[in-house]
Amino acid sequence: MENLIIYAFIYLLSSIPFGLILAKFFAKTDIKKEGSKSIGATNVLRVVKEKNPKLAKKLAIATIILDFAKAAIPLLTLKFLHYDQALLWSVAVLAILGHCFSIYLLFEGGKGIATGAGAMIVLLPLEVLTAFIVWVVIGKIFKISSLASLAALLAFVVSSFIFNYDLEIHTHAPVFIIAFIIVYKHLPNIKRLIFKEECKVI
């Protein structure tokens, strides 16, 4: 019963669309109706930037921090309380599911990068650092958020086998589930990348 309460809490918490809330409250803009219609930091930056560039950067950074924290803080708390690895990985997957398929948005949502990073920084920090370096490098070179994110995801999955070939839960299934969710949410971006139609962020 305790585990079910934890799972429900994590899903409801991670479902909170911080990017949407921040853009509506501070910029009076509905990002679900503009840009890529995603609730993530990239769309916050892209949409709000048209009206207020300085505010756009602040809101995008705040969105990243909050989306990251809504997974990282609960997982850090549970880890501190010595909950087992199986529960921690279940919580990580649910956090990403909640963000990507928010109950408050009729199961629509973001693309899972910041929330995924927040979850994985607790469980696989070295892999997240590797992914972050790849994200920065690809982002600097191509200035395409989705390409940088997908490259970082690939780096994360590959490095998870290099640095943690035998996870404590004895399976990489949660890593693949998380990767699948994120790739699924990026399918429109992948299509635009193939046809060279994806927009640059900067």
Curated annotation (Swiss-Prot):
Query: Which EC numbers does the record give?
Result: 2.3.1.275
Q: Which UniProt keywords apply?
A: Cell inner membrane, Cell membrane, Lipid biosynthesis, Lipid metabolism, Membrane, Phospholipid biosynthesis, Phospholipid metabolism, Transferase, Transmembrane, Transmembrane helix
Q: Name one GO biological process term.
A: phospholipid biosynthetic process
Record membrane topology: Multi-pass membrane protein
So, what pathway does this thing act in?
Answer: Lipid metabolism; phospholipid metabolism
Q: Which domain of life is it from?
A: Bacteria
Q: What class of enzyme is it?
A: transferase
Segments crossing the lipid bilayer? 3-23, 87-107, 118-138, 144-164, 167-187
Q: What chemistry does it catalyse, as a reaction equation?
A: an acyl phosphate + sn-glycerol 3-phosphate = a 1-acyl-sn-glycero-3-phosphate + phosphate
* SS bond list: none
Q: Where in the cell is the protein located?
A: Cell inner membrane
Keyword Lipid metabolism attached? yes
User: In the UniProt record, which is one GO cellular component term?
Assistant: plasma membrane
Sorted alphabetically, which InterPro entries does this protein's record hold?
Answer: G3P_acylTferase_PlsY
- MF annotations from Gene Ontology: acyl-phosphate glycerol-3-phosphate acyltransferase activity
Task: Output the PANTHER family linked to this UniProt entry.
Answer: GLYCEROL-3-PHOSPHATE ACYLTRANSFERASE-RELATED, INNER MEMBRANE PROTEIN YGIH
Tell me how this protein assembles: Probably interacts with PlsX.
Annotated function? Catalyzes the transfer of an acyl group from acyl-phosphate (acyl-PO(4)) to glycerol-3-phosphate (G3P) to form lysophosphatidic acid (LPA). This enzyme utilizes acyl-phosphate as fatty acyl donor, but not acyl-CoA or acyl-ACP.
For this chain, the family text in UniProt reads: Belongs to the PlsY family.
Name of protein: Glycerol-3-phosphate acyltransferase
**Which source organism does the UniProt entry give?**
Campylobacter jejuni (strain RM1221)
Upper taxonomic classification of the species?
Answer: Bacteria, Pseudomonadati, Campylobacterota, Epsilonproteobacteria, Campylobacterales
Q: Which gene encodes it?
A: plsY
